[in-house]
A protein has these predicted regions:
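Conserved helicase C-terminal RecA-like lobe
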Residues: 1-3
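RecB-family 4Fe-4S metal-dependent nuclease core
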Residues: 9-11, 17-43, 51, 55, ...
């Protein structure tokens, strides 16, 4: 880069041979900062790309595709090139090109008979399945309707890790509730760590029962999970509010959801529900915690698109449960007011950090080990989020029951639903030639006020229609 005397041209590809978006080198960002006034040109002039007969055909294909998409910026050059190939006796090639241009990689809606079968087999739907449908309807179709699965390989993956840690947390919190009357302050560090290790070992043995694993790999993973388990329980104990008491653990639910003339059951498991009972004010405050073995944050933009429904729906389910358990058979004047105070994700981890000493390392870990979610700073805002989650779930089920299985993977910034999809070879999603399109997220989480306003408008309109 330092050798040119007169001019330096920098270029980069935007798309790989398999039509996947490619990010440019980090060097280009540095160059842009050094020369902020320099303009970036998008590609070569059309005529400069025509070098051989083959490259000319490629340029012609791009030009015709632009015309089909309503882009007439190269119309004159494309028509001239078409006439040139037609004149030189390439009519057969042009006919094949024309047929190829009509190719569309678009699935049709499912027939009514098929959707009737779906209604029979899927009257119970997990919230995670709805999120998958919102992420990409076609991937949902392949996985849950056709039931295509990757070859099962016995081994270790994130699902195993999640099951082990979830099971250990459930046992630990039940132990403190049943044996210590929820008095976490009476639990010594030695007893806490010993019980955590015991519960992790129990769940580890249960999860991998009957499987042959490499002894070394097995032991490294087991010790790692014990370390994560101890760190998680230690942190959750430290964050324990004196007012709130953990009451519900791994609560499996079935929530009725009205979809048109049909009823569907939403199913799921709530990791933890904490209660604060204020007898003087006759109120019960609810806090819902959902454990995650991977990094996860609550995002209003994702909730709006249907990608983030779990936490809000789980919180609404727990609100109904608490109301039923505490207010059943009570007179109207004696009923508790149920207040949903907050809903959080907690990432179960023992993060590696860079620091000068152990004190700084511990402080860095503390900053990462926090609840992430939504607190009830504004009652109307919180209730809008819960109401919108139920509305969006109903809307997704309605779309699903009508047979829509579009290849519409969600795209947000540089992330797409296709990035880790197991069905790429079946789907063959292709923006360039298959007429496939990404579904871009409408709002980012930063547009909080606009998001809440639209959610409120949608929910308010739905209530008026149901009257």
């Amino acid at each position: 880069m330092t050798k040119p005397k007169d001019c330096l041209h920098l270029s980069y590809v935007c798309m790989s041979a398999t039509n996947e978006t490619m990010r440019p080198s980090y060097i280009l960002d540095r160059i842009r900062r050094i020369f902020p006034d320099k303009k970036e040109l998008q590609g070569q002039r059309m005529e400069n790309r025509i070098v051989t007969n083959k490259s000319g055909l490629e340029v012609l294909i791009i030009g015709i595709r632009e015309l089909l998409e309503g882009n007439h910026s190269h119309e004159k050059e494309t028509l001239q090139l078409y006439k040139l190939y037609l004149k030189h006796g390439d009519a057969r090639t042009l006919e094949r090109m024309k047929q190829a241009m009509q190719y569309q990689n678009l699935p049709e809606k499912l027939a009514e008979q098929v959707t009737q079968l779906i209604r029979l087999q899927d009257m119970a739907m997990s919230v995670s399945k709805l999120e998958q449908y919102a992420s990409c309807a076609y991937a949902f179709f392949l996985r849950y309707i056709l039931r295509l699965e990757e070859r099962q390989i016995h081994g270790i993956d994130n699902r195993n890790v999640g099951m082990i840690l979830h099971g250990a947390m459930e046992q630990m919190f039940c132990y403190v509730r049943d044996q210590k009357d929820n008095a976490w302050e009476t639990l010594s560090e030695q007893e806490r760590d010993a019980k955590t290790e015991e519960f992790v070992n129990e769940n580890f043995a249960k999860e991998y029962a009957g499987q042959e694993l490499d002894a070394g790999q097995y032991e490294v993973l087991r010790k790692s999970l014990i370390r994560i388990g101890k760190r998680t329980v230690q942190k959750l104990q430290a964050m324990m509010d004196a007012s709130y008491k953990p009451r519900y653990f791994e609560y499996a639910f079935r929530k009725k959801l009205q979809v048109g003339d049909e009823q569907l059951s939403l199913v799921g498991v709530v990791d933890r529900g904490d209660l604060y009972v204020n007898e003087a004010e006759q109120t019960i405050s609810l806090r819902v915690i959902d454990y995650k073995s991977g990094a996860h944050e609550f995002d209003l933009g994702d909730l709006y698109e249907g990608l983030e429904l779990q936490l809000a729906i789980y919180t609404d389910v727990m609100r109904e449960l608490v109301d039923q358990e505490w207010n059943k058979n009570r007179a109207e004047t004696e009923r508790y007011k149920i207040v949903t105070d907050s809903m959080y994700y907690y990432h179960m981890q023992d993060p590696y950090v860079q620091a000068e000493n152990e004190t700084e390392a511990e402080e860095a870990r503390e900053r990462q080990l926090t609840y992430k979610g939504l607190a009830r700073d504004d009652a109307e805002e919180f209730d809008t989020v819960l109401a919108y989650a139920e509305y969006k779930a109903s809307a997704l089920v309605t779309q699903m029951k009508s047979g829509v299985i579009d290849k519409n993977p969600m795209r947000e910034s540089n992330k797409t639903a296709c990035d880790y999809c197991a069905y790429k070879d079946v789907c063959r999603f292709d923006e360039k030639y298959g007429n496939n399109r990404y579904h871009y997220t409408k709002h980012s989480a930063k547009e909080k006020e606009q998001l809440l306003e639209e959610m409120h408008s949608v929910c308010h309109g739905q209530k008026n229609r149901n009257r």
